[in-house]
Amino acid sequence: MKRKILLITAILLVAVLLAGMVAAYLAAAAMYKKSFNYRCTTSVSDRYDIEKFPAMTRSRHTFPTRQGHLLTGYLYGSADGAAPKALVVFAHGLGAGGQTGYLPIFDYLVQNGYCVFAYDATGNDESEGEAIGSLIQGYIDMDYAVTYAQGLEETAGLPLVLMGYSWGALSAGNTLNTHPEAAAVVTIAGWNRARDLVEDSTRRKMGKAGNLVIPFISLYEFVTYGKYASSTAMKGFERSDCGAMIIHGELDGTVPIEYGYDIYAAKYENAPRFTFVRYSDRGHVNILPKSSTGFSGELLAQIVAFCDKWVG
């Protein structure tokens, strides 16, 4: 009789424990979804008109991402029909909308011999998706964007450069895991792993209790995103032998430099294929200084010189 009571007690304890874990998982999943349950639209003040860049043409494209909804992208090329030396796939940041806010960068790259494929990520501007979904969604979208862009007749056989700002830089580094054939990658104010900023935000909001929630957030990401959930830029650097240019500002309060640049430099600072650009006086937004005509050409010139070296 005593053994039977112990067995029943053990079963009840296991049931309560499992119920608690399921409840914690569902709560973490709901919190996670709520955090990314919004769309982003580029404001009028941040949007650039293609007509202001007469040296550049573009063609509109749509392609499906992993969930099946359609993303919108544009292939930018030279108005004089000059053959490009390489294809740059560019991923935008999070919060200000899609790719249309970066046209001066594309124009600079095009005038220096590159074609650029830039797209609106899930839940941004012209792309489908009720919400952005997650930070991981960024490099899922970039994976599919690269595959699509490489399949275009205009880009056939061109060396590939992955490039992005902030969330897009996270995506660019992580996309090396699925596209290690890239000749070069340029990350501007990015970081290593999507979960790092999610964990940081969770701890700031919940204090020590956040440490109890984080494992369930990780489980939700794995269940939802599969192989992409365990991706990191560091793994991408190990999979590829491409050139890597890492750009960051020490004053960045949005993506702290220790979440990306410092991690990469600890291993690769003396590696010949890595170029590190660290600014002591720049933060997140002003990492690419703006002039009256768009983005300052100082850093863009460094980026082009770096890419030229790696695309041959």
Question: How would you name each of these model-derived features?
Answer:
Residues 270-312:
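C-terminal catalytic histidine-bearing segment of alpha/beta-hydrolase fold enzymes
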Residues 108-128:
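Conserved alpha/beta-hydrolase
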Residues 98, 122-156:
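Catalytic nucleophile-loop/oxyanion-hole region of alpha/beta-hydrolase
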Residues 94-107, 121:
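The serine-hydrolase catalytic nucleophile loop
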Residues 16-64, 74:
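An N-terminal hydrophobic leader/cap segment in hydrolases
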Residues 242, 256-266:
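Short alpha-helix in the alpha/beta-hydrolase fold that links the catalytic acid
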Residues 240, 246-248, 252:
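Short beta-strand/loop motif that positions the catalytic acidic residue
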Residues 174-226:
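Hydrolase active-site cap/lid region
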